[in-house]
Amino acid sequence: MLHRKTRSGSVQSVDLQAVHPTTRKIPPFLIRVAVLWGCLLAGLFFALIAYGNTAGPSEPPPATGPVEHPTSVSRSTNSSDWELVMAVHPKCPCTVASVNELQRLLRQVDNQLTCRFLVYHPADTNSDWMDGKITSRLSRIPHASIQADEAGKAAMELGMKTSGAVVVFDPHGKPRFHGGITASRNHEGDNLGVRSISMLLRGQTPPLTSTPVFGCRL
């Protein structure tokens, strides 16, 4: 309580709380909840970044080509074109970016590549399981063929264990590049995979002959 004189000389009492109201404190448990919520959001953010930059399994293709049996990928010995073989999981959303990057690559090299798509389907299903937007888009790519790949056997013969993986063969049937053609999961844009393949087809020395693959495991 504060006492002050008025102009008339009388003494007036002033309530300080009325002049400066007391600030209400935030309950400690609300502060803890806010901190925990912030930590959770930060953790999820960094987890998504880590997931997007985590490559799937991949191995080099055999130098002599795949073992011959009905599921194997075979090349025509008379082919004078470079060939790109891609492993595709038709239900993998990350593969959309790989298909888009492939189409960008084909524009860069004036469609000098023939393409073969090994489209995965589980062993207990028929080839209808492959139907969908991704397979439909693949069917519209020029100079391309689609092969049903039961349980991913043909892809794995070439070391491809992740959707979006590619192997590029020169006209003599020798594998010259293997890996992915995106910089991370579901990411489109300039990347070393597309750049390296493009340089190979121009007769230049690429910076890499292998890159990480980002996509769903077959």
Residue ranges: model-predicted function:
Residues V168-D170, P175-R176, G180-L218:
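Thiol-/selenol-based redox modules, centered on thioredoxin-like
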Residues P60-W82, E101-R107:
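A short beta-strand-turn-helix
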Residues T77-L102, Q112, R116, I197:
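Short active-site neighborhood of thiol/selenol oxidoreductases, capturing the structured segment around
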Residues V96-L138, A148-E157:
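Structural microenvironment flanking redox-active thiols in thiol-disulfide oxidoreductases
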Residues M1-P70:
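N-terminal targeting signals for export/organelle localization
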Residues C92-T95, V166, C216:
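The canonical Cys-X-X-Cys-His
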Residues I134-D170, P175-R176:
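Short, internal strand/loop/helix patches
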Residues H89, L118-P122, P171:
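Cofactor-binding loop segments of dinucleotide-utilizing enzymes, especially the Rossmann-like FAD-
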